[in-house]
């Protein structure tokens, strides 16, 4: 009977995740049209911030308990998943006939690169995460949000839809459905795995690691179906930006100092794959199964390297 309840919970979570992601992307497009902003800006702000909420809660909670290791590990792991797993899903989910160079605002990728560089280089030089770093990152991310919203505008040719009523309400509710659905999927998947005797180490490095990226993955599939890869890359850059500039800053300011784990390798991987995502966003975007599967294999190899 217990397995039936868990499977029902898993199924409900999956439905909420998929339907919520569809509506979230649709609402993001409508919000972009209403405020005459490129879709990539909404992807970087509204969706990027929303899908970083789980990391914010988890890392802040860990920092409040004095566990900066867990908070930083969560951020680094999430950014690697965004730059490998989410990009892989995009290249696999795009329609076969889609091929175009996307119009992407340059603020979010440039500042993601800057904040990532500051974050990584500070640790490499000082071997710690000082309070000042957290304060600087927080100030920078606030400035970036202001720049993105105040300086970008959309061309008339991009105004393809009509404004719909209650788009903010729809967007907010769909985001909540996506986040709650992903949590239901992860919680029930973990419970099912434990029921069958799967170790906590395997569960943590697979189900939970991938589960934290489910909102981004679901949103990517929806955006790909709508032929909106600009939203996907906007979400990747925005999510990575918020993970470091907001989530990381908050965790560091709450619990600054050294961490006991050695994360130089993970930081290098995060830095490297973040710039790969920027490079790919500047080229013609089309369905590429080879690249998609290559990125998935790379992500799996990264997970195995953590053992």
What spans do the regions from the language model cover?
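Hydrophobic alpha-helical segments, chiefly the membrane-spanning helices
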Residues: 1-307
